[in-house]
């Protein structure tokens, strides 16, 4: 089966989700069609056709012009290749895939990932463009796939046809995201979480400029690591995490490590407390090293500008490594968290987050190991790439008949 994998732009890292299924389904003949790609991971050995490489130029006028010119070229390239199925990731920038499917009569599968499913998100030209692409994808897709039940409900509210919409959890490779080979070192005993009154605002007790930019693993194995992996943005809640961690650091010593980049990176580097370490973007192997080193991974994604977290694959990656997670109860996040083993925080405030992190750091080594094993087992059984691939294979076979 020839499958055209289409996406507006392809950046790997970090967007491994766009190619994970293709790499796990070698029985299909894959070709990626995109406006522009930047793939620095040599393991992503897929043929890629770029319709407008200059789209990644930082100059906005050049980027916009080449994007417009590249849409038709991308559509024609997909049609000329003659695929059996076209699979578009994200409704935004789906016009070439929709057009190619229409003119060639090929079935179109569209995976919705987040903001592309919302009926009204922002204003201006960007919002109008998103709406145009979303309508085209909803009308032209043979099957619409949402990465969580939450996002499927968002899509239904935006006008998606329920008869063509289903949930397809992306899954993570549990043969790659695995616990550390060596046993986790024992730690000093920490008391149970303290009970203390909540302040009006959690203070950040640090002078500006203390955030350390360092990607190396810590030598002090006894100091527990609280880890964040993702975009350093308000949507991902990294500001809440730093505030919560700072309030806890004196009474519950730990190191907060932030892996990634984003709009809040500069501010965090300038003002983060001394126990916070920023690594910047890292290769996937280095991310896994940090995940395995962590005692708990925290993803406090919160509603921002009308949208919420659709899934949160980093939660699955961490739990596949046997590391429990702490997350805000928002959007599709609860669907990615092992029931009874990881922690969901209903109150989305730095104070509530601090209490949840405190609870996680108080777990004994035995309890941590038990929770980690439960996390690993749940992800392997319910959210593995293996299961996701099996479902996708069935979908392809159904639409290609």
Language model segments and positions:
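Conserved donor-binding/catalytic core segment of Leloir-type glycosyltransferases
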Residues: 4, 145, 185-201, 205-209, ...
């Amino acid at each position: 089966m020839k499958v055209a994998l289409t996406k507006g732009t392809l950046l790997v890292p970090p967007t491994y989700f766009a190619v994970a299924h293709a790499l796990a389904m070698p029985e299909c003949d894959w070709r990626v069609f995109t406006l522009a790609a930047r793939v620095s991971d040599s393991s992503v050995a897929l043929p890629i056709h770029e319709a407008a490489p200059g789209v990644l130029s930082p100059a906005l006028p050049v980027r916009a012009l080449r994007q417009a010119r590249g849409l038709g070229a991308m559509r024609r390239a997909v049609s000329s290749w003659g695929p059996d199925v076209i699979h578009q990731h994200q409704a935004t920038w789906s016009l070439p895939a929709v057009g190619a499917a229409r003119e060639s009569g090929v079935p179109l599968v569209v995976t919705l990932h987040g903001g592309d499913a919302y009926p009204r998100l922002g204003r201006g030209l960007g919002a109008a463009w998103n709406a145009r692409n979303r309508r085209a994808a909803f009308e032209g897709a043979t099957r619409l796939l949402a990465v969580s039940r939450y996002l499927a409900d968002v899509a239904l509210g935006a006008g998606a046809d329920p008869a063509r919409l289903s949930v397809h959890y992306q899954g993570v490779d549990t043969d790659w995201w695995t616990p550390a080979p060596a046993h986790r070192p024992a730690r000093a005993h920490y008391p149970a979480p303290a009970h203390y009154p909540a302040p009006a605002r959690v203070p950040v007790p640090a002078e500006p400029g203390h955030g350390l930019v360092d990607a190396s693993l810590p030598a002090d194995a006894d100091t527990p690591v609280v880890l964040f992996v993702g975009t350093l943005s308000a949507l991902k809640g990294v500001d809440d995490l730093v505030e919560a961690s700072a309030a806890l650091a004196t009474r519950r010593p730990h190191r907060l490590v932030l892996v990634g980049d984003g709009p809040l990176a500069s501010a965090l580097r300038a003002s983060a407390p001394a126990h916070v370490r920023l690594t910047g973007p890292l290769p996937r192997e280095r991310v896994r090293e940090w995940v395995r080193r962590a005692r708990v991974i925290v993803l406090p994604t919160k509603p921002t500008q009308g949208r919420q977290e659709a899934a949160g694959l980093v939660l699955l990656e961490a739990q596949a490594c046997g590391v429990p997670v702490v997350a805000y109860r928002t959007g599709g996040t609860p669907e990615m968290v092992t029931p009874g083993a990881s922690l969901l925080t209903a109150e989305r405030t730095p104070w509530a987050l601090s209490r949840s992190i405190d609870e996680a750091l108080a777990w004994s080594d035995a309890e941590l190991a038990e929770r980690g094993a439960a996390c690993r087992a749940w992800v392997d059984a319910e959210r593995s790439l293996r299961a996701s691939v099996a479902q996708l294979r069935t979908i392809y076979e159904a639409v290609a008949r």
